[in-house]
Amino acid sequence: MTHDTTSRPSSSRVWRLLLVGSALTAVVGGGMHPDSDASDPLRERLATMTADDQWVLGHAFIVVSTALLALGLRAARQAPGWSPAVRRALTVAAVAVGLYVVETVAHLAAVVDSDALAAGDAAPVAWAHVGLSAVLYPLSGWAIASLALATARGASPLRRVVAGVGLLAGVVHAASIPLMLLLPDLEASRLFPVAAIGIALWTLGTGLLGAPRTAPAGTEVPDRAPQPVT
C-alpha cells in the first residue's frame, strides 16, 4: 500500500501552467495595445488610445493575463521546494497582483469615456483608472520585485537570471505611473512596454523552471516519490 501523491505533481503543474498562460496572454494583449505620442498630455493620449478598435480586446487579454498571474502565484505557495521567505513573498505578491486585476478592469472600462476625453468633458471612469494605477502599479511592482529577489537567494545561475529580469521589471513597473504623473516631461509612459515585457519574461521563466527541487539550507523538501506504508 502506498501514499497517494498524484495531487502534488498535479498541483505543481497547475501553477506553472497558470504562469505560462499569463505570460502568453500578456504578450498577445500587449501587442494589441494602441500607440500614442508620449509627448502629448495624458488626456489626449487616453482619448487617442481608447478610440482605437484594439483597445477592448487587447485589454481583455491583459485582464486575463493578470488574473492568471494572481492565481498562479497563489497556487505556487503550495509547491514544495520554496523557502519560507519565498512563500511569504508569494503570498504578498498574490494579494498585490490580485488587487492589480481591479486596475486592469478599470483600464479596460476607460473605453466608455473615450468621447468625453476627446471633447474635454468629465471622464470619471478613465480618471478612476488613473487613480487606481497610481496606487496599484507601485504596490504590484514592488511585490513582484520582492518576490524575484527572494527567489534569487541561494538559487542556480539560470534562476538568478530569471529573478534579475523580474526584479528589474517589477521596479520599472512600480515607478512608471508615479514618474508619468509627477514628471510628465520625462515621457515615462515609454517604460510601460519595458515593464510589461520584463514581467512576461519573468513569469514565463518562473513557470517553465518551476520550484527548485531542493530548498535553501535549513528547509526541508518533502520527498515526492511514493513511500510504502509499513
For each of these PLM feature ranges, what is it?
Residues 2-230:
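Hydrophobic, aromatic-enriched alpha-helical segments typical of multi-pass transmembrane helices
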